[in-house]
Structures are given as structure tokens and as C-alpha cells.
């Protein structure tokens, strides 16, 4: 199989059950979420989440085996993976553009139902120089630490790369905890007019991306501890770093538009 895969200029994917189990898990997860919304029963939701997590772990394990131990990630394959990550991030940019469009469409010309003002009548927005500003500083600091880790890997400095990755993961966890606290103390809900809807959908999806990025970086941290990255073969880390910088930039736009200008 190794010889066959290296004798042609194509990225041949081995047979894998994980796309199927991932699709089944996603179906169960969305069905369970709908059930949870209506009946407050999380059983089906937790089953779907378990299937998704197990699929992720085993799918990533197979990709690591192919790229690190079998040598299947040739230069052409790596180029394809890079373009795939670039296109994925581009699709995420358009995804968040729709949220900003909804926010500015509502805020630049408030309707009479909103009291002809923004924020709408009765809405007490967050103070942008409190938790939101702290979260901004946390993500900016995490951008510095992930860059530190990247340069350390390219310079074959194992210990500093480990430190940079560890600090980035910790900052990601800290951001998520602060976001949860902010939601818990929020003086408005997702049902409070279009302001509440756009606020929680935009910041909530960004928070989900922070959790995904933190998981991605935690995986890279574990792989680095197992000496699976070299100075010229570490695209898994590069992809995680690109994704994390994207999350940073999106948060800056969220902070400036929703927290600062929108308040």
C-alpha cells in the first residue's frame, strides 16, 4: 500500500469508516439537540457528542499514522492539505460575514419596534472595557505565544515550542471560562430582540471556534510531546496556528463592532 501510494502524483485516501461514523454522529447530535430544546432531555445529545468525539480521535490518529509513520504526506499531499485549510478558513470568513451583515443591517437603521435606537430600548449592553477587553488581551497574547511556538519548532527548540503551545492552550481555556461567566451574568438573553439574537449567535459561534481551536492546539501539544513534529514537517501545527490567528482576527472585529461600537 505504501509503494502504491508513492508511485503517482495523487493523494490516494485509504478506506476509512470515520466519514460514515462522523456523519451518523452529526445526525444524532442535531437530533439530540432538537430533543433537548423541546424536552430538556440530553440523552440523545450526549450519545451524538460521544460518537463525534470518538470519531475525531480515531480519524486524527489515522492521519497522524499516515503522515508521521508511513510517510504518505509527500510534498504534493502537503500542498493539497494547505490549500484545503486555506479554502476552509475562507469559507469560515464568509460564515462570520453573514453574522456581521445581520448585526449592521439591524443596528445602522433601527426600526420603530426597537425604539429607533441602538442598542434597543430596555437592553443594557456589556461594558466594553471590562471582560470583553480582558478577552481581547487574552487572545492577542495567545497570538504571540502561538507564533513563539511556531518559530521554536522551525528552530528545533523543543522546550520553548512546548512552553509556547502550553501557554496558548491555557489562554484558550481561560478565554472560554470568561466567556461562560459573561453569558451567565448577561442582563439580556438571545430572545431579547434582534440585539440579543445577533450578539449571542455571533459571539457564541466564535466561542465554539475557540473551543475547536483549543482542542486542535491541545492535540498539537500532545503530538509535540511525542516528538512528532520536525522543523520541516509540521503542517498539523501550522494548520492549527492559521486557524487560531483567524479566530483572533474575528474576535477583534467582534469586539470593535458589537462590544464597543454597538454599545
UniProtKB/Swiss-Prot annotation:
The chain crosses the membrane at residues 9-29, 40-60, 84-104, 129-149, 161-181, 198-218, 241-261. Its EC number is 7.1.1.9. Disulfide bonds: none annotated. It catalyses: 4 Fe(II)-[cytochrome c] + O2 + 8 H(+)(in) = 4 Fe(III)-[cytochrome c] + 2 H2O + 4 H(+)(out). GO terms for cellular component: mitochondrial inner membrane. GO terms for biological process: mitochondrial electron transport, cytochrome c to oxygen. One of its GO terms (molecular function) is cytochrome-c oxidase activity. Its main location: mitochondrion. Pfam families: COX3 (PF00510). It is a multi-pass membrane protein. It is found in: Mitochondrion inner membrane. Gene3D superfamilies: 1.10.287.70, Cytochrome c oxidase, subunit III, four-helix bundle. CDD domains: Cyt_c_Oxidase_III. Keywords: Membrane, Mitochondrion, Mitochondrion inner membrane, Translocase, Transmembrane, Transmembrane helix. Component of the cytochrome c oxidase (complex IV, CIV), a multisubunit enzyme composed of a catalytic core of 3 subunits and several supernumerary subunits. The complex exists as a monomer or a dimer and forms supercomplexes (SCs) in the inner mitochondrial membrane with ubiquinol-cytochrome c oxidoreductase (cytochrome b-c1 complex, complex III, CIII). Belongs to the cytochrome c oxidase subunit 3 family. Component of the cytochrome c oxidase, the last enzyme in the mitochondrial electron transport chain which drives oxidative phosphorylation. The respiratory chain contains 3 multisubunit complexes succinate dehydrogenase (complex II, CII), ubiquinol-cytochrome c oxidoreductase (cytochrome b-c1 complex, complex III, CIII) and cytochrome c oxidase (complex IV, CIV), that cooperate to transfer electrons derived from NADH and succinate to molecular oxygen, creating an electrochemical gradient over the inner membrane that drives transmembrane transport and the ATP synthase. PANTHER family: CYTOCHROME C OXIDASE SUBUNIT 3, CYTOCHROME C OXIDASE SUBUNIT III. This is Cytochrome c oxidase subunit 3. The gene is COIII.
Amino acid at each position: 500500500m505504501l509503494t502504491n501510494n508513492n508511485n503517482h502524483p495523487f493523494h490516494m485516501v485509504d478506506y476509512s469508516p470515520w466519514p460514515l461514523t462522523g456523519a451518523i454522529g452529526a445526525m444524532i447530535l442535531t437530533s439530540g439537540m432538537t430533543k433537548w430544546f423541546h424536552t430538556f432531555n440530553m440523552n440523545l445529545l450526549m450519545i451524538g457528542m460521544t460518537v463525534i468525539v470518538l470519531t475525531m480521535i480515531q480519524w486524527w490518529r489515522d492521519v497522524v499514522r499516515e503522515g508521521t509513520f508511513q510517510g504518505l504526506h509527500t510534498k504534493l499531499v502537503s500542498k493539497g492539505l494547505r490549500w484545503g485549510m486555506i479554502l476552509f478558513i475562507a469559507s469560515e470568513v464568509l460564515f462570520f460575514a453573514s453574522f456581521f451583515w445581520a448585526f449592521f443591517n439591524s443596528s445602522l437603521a433601527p426600526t420603530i419596534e426597537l425604539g429607533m435606537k441602538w442598542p434597543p430600548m430596555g437592553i443594557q449592553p456589556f461594558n466594553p472595557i471590562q471582560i470583553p477587553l480582558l478577552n481581547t488581551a487574552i487572545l492577542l497574547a495567545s497570538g504571540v505565544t502561538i507564533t513563539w511556538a511556531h518559530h521554536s519548532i522551525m528552530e528545533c527548540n523543543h522546550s520553548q515550542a512546548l512552553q509556547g503551545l502550553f501557554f496558548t492552550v491555557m489562554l484558550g481555556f481561560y478565554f472560554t471560562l470568561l466567556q461562560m461567566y459573561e453569558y451567565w451574568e448577561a442582563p439580556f438573553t438571545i430572545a431579547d430582540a434582534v440585539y440579543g439574537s445577533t450578539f449571542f449567535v455571533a459571539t457564541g459561534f466564535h466561542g465554539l471556534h475557540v473551543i475547536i481551536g483549543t482542542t486542535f492546539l491541545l492535540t498539537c501539544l500532545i503530538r509535540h510531546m511525542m516528538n512528532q513534529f520536525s522543523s520541516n514537517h509540521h503542517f498539523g501545527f501550522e494548520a492549527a496556528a492559521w486557524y487560531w490567528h483567524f479566530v483572533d482576527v474575528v474576535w477583534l472585529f467582534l469586539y470593535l463592532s458589537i462590544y464597543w461600537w454597538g454599545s
